[in-house]
Each structure stands twice: as structure tokens, then as C-alpha cells.
Design a protein with these regions (language model features):
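Alpha-helical interface subdomain recognition
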Residues: 1-80, 84, 90, 102-107, ...
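A short, Trp-centered hydrophobic/proline-enriched beta-strand micro-motif
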Residues: 117-127
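A short core secondary-structure module
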Residues: 143, 150-186
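Short beta-strand-to-turn element immediately C-terminal to the catalytic PLP-Schiff-base lysine
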Residues: 100-103, 139, 165-168, 177-179, ...
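Active-site-adjacent elements of ketosynthase-type condensing enzymes
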Residues: 116, 129-136
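Well-ordered alpha-helical segments within folded domains of soluble proteins
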Residues: 91-96
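Structural signature of FAD isoalloxazine-binding scaffolds in flavoprotein oxidoreductases
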Residues: 64-74, 130-132, 204, 209-210
Length: 370
């Protein structure tokens, strides 16, 4: 009996997303990376499938599904294109989740319905709370506040209709919902190592007004809320890493069987077999951790520590497997004719965009030392 059990609805999600990804995304992934964007037709199809609003309650037009279902969808998407999977992960984990959990009735009605209808949200990732907005200038003019600041990494920024932005003040860190095009806000391109079509870009604010109604989480509870959002995102990011791991392994197995040296396939060489075995071990270890974390969240059980462990294991495993995949491919692993160099760059980028590995290890240690 498998330790991971999925129901019929979740099996259907896996089947539908897998079919969509393998037939429409896999062949387009290289072009998307080259162009640095996801075609509007693909984004529209993702919206029609309900993936942008997968965790949004049905009352707001979403799919109302659980985290296990989200992980299944992200895993299948990432097998074909990690950038697209990351776009969906950010929308659900870093945008939908905080709006669902912390938004007022008015905010939920205004934003969740838009997302379920196809809108995309951006999020400025927070790793070290102490350096958020270190150059942030907040000015007050009576009842109004104005922000001047730069955020060099904003996830989904190039695709987003609105953003969730952390703002640091003397009272702490607040989260604000800011619509695209507000006065004084400008977007600028950034060149990334990996996840090149995921819409990562920068945002700059010059004396932009922050109205009271734009505040999602106040400074008094901002740090706790940000950590809660990160804890949730660990599960989704882990699923993206799992898909990347499987793509690297599948490409390596295929190449090893086809590549001939000294009159036989390199799959017969013990050193290649050892690398493939290590890759498979990492995949299955990550799979168990990820779906355990997801099932605990869905059962309303304590999940944060296992989610951090899953995120560490899967993201570090994806980098390790990516390196092994390049080794298996030899010189071809270095060229863009084969996808493994992209898998590696995407894996390394994914590892750096969430909570940093040292921070997660410290939090795990604190939990077990309580």
C-alpha cells in the first residue's frame, strides 16, 4: 500500500494537467525561455483550467481545492516548464493564500473574484525581515502616507495586475495590496539565471500614496503573517522542485539509453547507473516529504516543520539532480539543444527565491529544541 493516497478527483487533476503540459507546454518551454515570457494563449488556458484560482473558495469563483491538489498540478506543470509552474505557485501560495487568510470581506470580494477570472498577482519575496525596505522612505502628509522604495525581485511582476508588497516602518512590516499602474510606480526588467519566463521583474515606487484600504496586514501582525505565508509557500515551491527533479531524471534516463560509447549504451556503465540511482532516491524522498506536508495541512495538523524539511530536501535535491543530469549528458548537458542545463538553472533559482536554506534550518532547529 502506498504511503501517498490520492482520491479520484486528484487523479483526474493529475491526468488533465499532465496531458496539457506534455502536449502544449513541453514543446514551447524553450521558446518561452528564449523570449522571456509566457504566451497569452497559454495563460488563458491555465485560467480556463482553474489553476490560477485553484485554492480560492467556490463562493469567489475558484476551484476550492486542497493543497494536495495544488501540489499535483504544480508537479505536473513543472515537469514541462518550471517557469509556468512557478507562476501558478506564486498566484496560489503567495497571493491567493494571504488574501484568503487575512483579507477583509471587501478585499476578498474585490481580488479573489478577479483572480478566479484570470488575473495574476505579484509578490515581493521576503527572506530577511530586517532588510525589507532598508531603503524605504515613508512620508506622512496628514492622513496620507507615501512610499519611495525599490524591490529588485518581484515574482510574477511582469504578468501581474496587482501586487502584495511588504512595507517596513518604525512599527514593523505591513503588507499592502497595490494595483498596477498606481501613480509613482514603475516596473523594470531584471535578467535572471533561471525561471526566465516566470515574469520576475523589479518595482520602484516614487512618492506613491498608500491608502488605508490598501493595507492587507498591519505592522502589528505583519511579521507573523509573512512567516505564515512563507510556511504555506514551502509546500507549493517543493512541488515545483519535484517536477523539475523528475524532468531531469527522465531526460537523463532517455539520453543514457540512447547514447552509445565503446559499442554499448552508457546506461550500462556502473558510474552512470550510480548517478541515476542517486537521482531516483532524491525524487522519491522529496515526494514522500512533500505530500506528507500537504496532507497535514489539509487535515489541519501542524505542518510547518515538515514543510520546511520538504522544501529543503526538494530544492537542494533538484540542484543536485540537475548537476548529475548535466554529468550524464556530458558535453551535451552544457548546450541548449538539451533541456537539462535549463532544469539546473531553474532549480538553483527556485532554491534562492523563497526562505533561504540557512533560515529554514535554524527554524527547524528551534522547533526540535523547544
Amino acid at each position: 500500500m502506498s504511503l501517498i493516497t490520492i482520491n479520484s478527483a486528484q487523479k483526474l487533476i493529475r491526468s488533465e494537467v499532465s496531458k496539457f503540459a506534455s502536449t502544449q507546454i513541453e514543446t514551447a518551454a524553450s521558446d518561452m525561455e528564449r523570449d522571456g515570457c509566457i504566451p497569452s494563449g497559454i495563460l488563458q488556458k491555465i485560467s480556463q483550467m482553474g489553476l490560477f484560482g485553484l485554492i480560492i473558495p467556490e463562493d469567489y469563483g475558484g476551484s476550492g481545492l486542497d493543497v494536495t491538489s495544488l501540489c499535483i498540478a504544480l508537479e505536473e506543470l513543472a515537469k514541462s516548464c518550471a517557469s509556468l509552474a512557478m507562476t501558478v505557485a506564486v498566484n496560489n501560495c503567495l497571493v491567493n493564500y494571504p488574501v484568503i487568510r487575512y483579507g477583509s470581506a471587501e478585499v476578498k470580494k474585490a481580488y479573489l473574484n478577479k483572480i478566479a477570472g484570470g488575473s495574476i498577482g505579484g509578490y515581493a519575496p521576503v527572506s530577511d525581515i530586517e532588510v525589507v525596505g532598508r531603503e524605504c522612505v515613508l512620508e506622512s502628509d496628514g492622513a496620507c502616507r507615501y512610499i519611495s522604495n525599490r524591490y529588485d525581485i518581484v515574482l510574477n511582476s511582469a504578468l501581474a495586475d496587482f501586487f502584495i508588497i511588504p512595507v517596513k516602518s518604525d512599527q514593523g512590516v505591513s503588507l499592502f495590496l497595490i494595483d498596477k499602474g498606481m501613480q509613482g510606480m514603475n516596473s523594470y526588467a531584471v535578467s535572471t539565471m533561471g525561471l526566465r519566463s516566470a515574469g520576475i521583474a523589479g518595482l520602484e515606487f516614487k512618492h506613491s500614496e498608500l491608502k488605508t484600504g490598501m493595507c492587507l496586514v498591519t505592522a502589528e501582525s505583519g511579521q507573523q503573517a509573512i512567516q505564515s505565508v512563507l510556511d504555506y509557500a514551502h509546500i507549493g515551491f517543493s512541488a515545483v522542485a519535484l517536477g523539475l527533479m523528475q524532468a531531469s531524471l527522465a531526460s537523463s534516463v532517455k539520453y543514457a539509453k540512447e547514447r552509445k560509447q565503446f559499442g554499448r549504451s552508457i546506461a550500462e556503465f556502473p558510474m552512470v547507473q550510480e548517478m541515476l540511482a542517486e537521482m531516483k532516491i532524491e525524487v522519491e524522498k522529496a515526494r514522500l516529504l512533500i505530500y506528507e506536508a500537504a496532507s497535514r495541512f489539509d487535515a489541519d495538523e501542524e505542518y510547518r516543520t515538515i514543510a520546511r524539511i520538504a522544501c529543503l530536501s526538494s530544492c537542494e535535491g533538484a540542484v543536485k539532480i540537475g548537476l548529475n543530469a548535466i554529468q550524464v549528458h556530458g558535453g551535451y548537458g552544457y548546450v541548449k539543444d538539451y533541456p537539462v542545463e535549463r532544469y539546473f538553472r531553474d532549480a538553483k533559482s527556485l532554491q534562492l527565491l523563497g526562505e533561504s536554506p540557512p533560515e529554514m534550518r535554524l527554524r527547524i532547529a528551534k522547533e526540535i529544541l523547544l
